[in-house]
Amino acid sequence: ENVLKGKHVGFSHFREEYIEHIAKQQWDNELLRHLSWDALHPWGLEEWKDFTINKGEDDRFLFAILENTTEEFIGWVSLSDVQLKNRGANLGIAILQKEQRGQGYGFEAVSLICKFAFYELGLHKIRLAVNSNNQNAIHVYEKVGFKKEGIDREALFQDGQWLDIYNYGILQKEWLQIIKAES
């Protein structure tokens, strides 16, 4: 059962059946280069289960992203480091399969998590960090309304070169203006 539902994707709580899918996809080089900024070792099913189902973190909301027609698990989206006093959180998202990227699922998932964060949690700001070479993700974030707030220069070493990490943010009032303008 979807917790939140958009036109093409919905969010659900994690189920054990999704974990094996994640474990298989964890070595997709294109996905991996944008998800992690450090050397990785493979996670087993138990580690993925701890990360998703037994998350045990009170300051994180983690949802499975499902395609609405097929109910196929296509990725995850999270709000982490949720701060009640400052009303902020960090956004993370992954669309697992290469053929599912570029289909608008990421845009809709980011829009849905913003709706959840601003309407349901009453957050003031959502932050994210993205590799400077991840142009597809940057396009999605800017299309949703995120603004570049800073650059962590040469913070990431990838393919023999130093890359910047861009820091983005969106305020509740900015998001509400965008939603109002679209309706």
What are these model-predicted stretches?
Residues 1-99, 162-163, 170-183:
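GNAT-family acyltransferases
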Residues 14, 116-118, 146:
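Conserved hydrophobic/aromatic "anchor" residues
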Residues 97-99, 103, 132-133:
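Active-site acidic-Proline motif in GNAT/NAT acetyltransferases
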Residues 102-116, 138-143:
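Conserved acetyl-CoA-binding loop-helix of GNAT-fold acetyltransferases
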Residues 106, 110, 133-137, 154-159:
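Short glycine/proline-centered loop/turn elements that form peptide/ligand docking sites
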Residues 119-129:
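Conserved GNAT acetyl-CoA-binding A-motif
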Residues 127-130, 147-163:
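Conserved catalytic-core motifs of GNAT/GCN5-like acyltransferases
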Residues 141, 146, 168:
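Conserved active-site tyrosine of GNAT-family acetyltransferases
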